Amino acid sequence: MLSLHRMRALLVKFRTMQVNQLRGLLYEFGATFRTGRAAGLAEIRARTAELEDAIPGTMMCCLQDQLRRIEELQLDIDLLEKRIGVWQKQDAACHAITAIPGIGRLTATALVATMGDAKAFRSGREFAAFLGLVPRQSGTGGKVRLGPMSKRGDPYVRTLLIHGARSVMYNAKVPTPWQRDIQARRPANVAAVALASKIARTAWAILARGQEYQRDYVSVRPA
């Protein structure tokens, strides 16, 4: 499964390079387009007739070739995502953690494949540390100082979790008390990493303990 994710990530990287190169080519002729990949490409296609009048024939052929390459890459990406989606629907673990806000098809499959046996980790915090989503600790004389996140583990999975956390923060109609508190006390990026860590710990708890996701669940340390 992780191999499919690696292949998809590489194709997305190639697609981004092709789109940026296309924008640069058109910018040389004074043509600018809306930001965003989908919106920009749609505008380029809609303005093809206009571009033909402003761009030499040879360069217009290059532009059309570039658009075809981007379309082919998109088809390959869509196919890989379809295969990942089939696996996600058939796998009970992926299905269970997809209920967590911030975890979609890509994150669920990558997280389950990375985690393996959830019981190999003693706690959700240990799993979050494995992914590099906990702060570094330092200090002397019994005083512990928390630094930036360790960034250990797989950067791809960590990035998926952070993107998912940002989506939750920006789109939640009714944020949980925890989310409201962390967003009020911390900068947006720090809050996103903290929420990503919480999402990872929640996923571990569901898989290690065989629980279902409960939005209002609050963990309590034993006395």
Region annotations inferred by a language model:
Residues M1-A96, Y217-P222:
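Glycine-rich, often acidic, oxyanion-interacting loops/wings at catalytic, nucleic-acid
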Residues G141-G142, L146, Q179-A223:
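Low-complexity, acidic/Ser/Thr- and charged residue-rich accessory regions of DNA metabolism proteins
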Residues G36, Q88-K89, K119-A120, N171, ...:
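Short, surface-exposed helix-loop/turn micro-motifs enriched in polar/charged residues
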